[in-house]
């Protein structure tokens, strides 16, 4: 997945600027650890090694799934580009071509995301949401081998590795809000390098940048990590519309907020919706001790 993402950005840079880009592989803790992400620091574990390589001068650019990127600033590093966002929706891959409504009672659904598990349980409280790790091919194999009845993954990730045909249902944001930044890529470079920043302006999509700015502003204001059960999705060109939700991990409580603002007001839009959610009691849900996903036997 990481190589596919990097190649996507490299090809875009070459097509738009004529500059050739070499892909340099970097192994992260998130790639090698078999522990659940919530146990080893959340999806930010995919970011640290890349940033270290960037600061050490081993690479000039680092490409991340934007939803993995911590919201706080990183010393010496700049978020220099957000290319056009891919499809942000979540997708189900289930046995025998089944949609969510077709699955048997108590069906086993694999997901390592508290956000996905919570929204699945809100849709169907009888499901068994089981924790999974490994790359997308490993997860898909657990379905074809019969270990799981289905898995929920990001549509964009499946598309990048050529597995769209395996999808049996795509969840609209009204059914399952994506993670903040889902479907978008982030390109970081060392701060204080104007030539690199100027180069990356060629691949930045301003509408995508505004949308993810609003979503990440909300996440930061809620003081929640990227593994928290929070969904957010903003879209629009001149005028942004955004929906957000905070949920209990068992799906029994979901707090929602929505609003709009001009693209230039993206950051404040995220703050405003976060404030609305906090007034509704979101901090209680974010701060509730969470049982491991696999223990939600309902």
Residue ranges and their predicted role:
Residues 59-63, 149-150:
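Short, Asp-centered acidic motifs that coordinate Mg2+ and/or phosphate
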């Amino acid at each position: 997945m990481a190589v596919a993402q990097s190649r996507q950005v490299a090809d875009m840079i070459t097509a738009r600027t004529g500059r050739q880009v070499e892909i340099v592989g970097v192994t992260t803790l998130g790639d090698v650890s078999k522990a659940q992400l919530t146990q080893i620091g959340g999806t930010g574990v995919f970011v640290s090694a890349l940033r270290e390589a960037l600061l050490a001068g081993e690479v000039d650019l680092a490409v991340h799934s934007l939803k993995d990127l911590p919201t706080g600033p990183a010393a010496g590093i700049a978020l220099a580009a957000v290319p056009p966002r891919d499809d942000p929706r979540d997708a189900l891959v289930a046995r025998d071509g089944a949609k969510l409504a077709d699955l048997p009672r108590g069906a086993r659904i694999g997901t390592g995301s508290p956000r996905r598990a919570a929204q699945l349980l809100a849709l169907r409280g009888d499901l068994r949401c089981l924790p999974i790790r490994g790359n997308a091919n490993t997860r898909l194999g657990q379905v074809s081998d019969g270990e799981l009845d289905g898995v929920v993954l990001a549509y964009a990730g499946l598309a990048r590795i050529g597995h769209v045909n395996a999808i049996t249902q795509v969840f609209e944001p009204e059914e399952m809000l994506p993670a903040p930044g889902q479907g978008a890529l982030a390109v970081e470079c060392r701060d204080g390098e104007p030539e690199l920043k100027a180069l990356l302006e060629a691949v930045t999509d301003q509408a995508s940048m505004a949308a993810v700015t609003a979503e990440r502003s909300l996440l930061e204001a809620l003081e929640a990590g990227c593994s928290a059960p929070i969904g957010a999705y903003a879209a629009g060109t001149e005028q942004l519309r955004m929906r957000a939700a905070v949920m209990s991990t068992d799906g029994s409580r979901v707090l929602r907020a929505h609003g709009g603002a001009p693209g230039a007001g993206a950051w404040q839009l995220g703050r405003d919706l976060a404030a609305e959610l906090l007034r509704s009691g979101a901090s209680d849900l974010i701060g509730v001790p969470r049982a491991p996903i696999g223990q939600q036997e309902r």
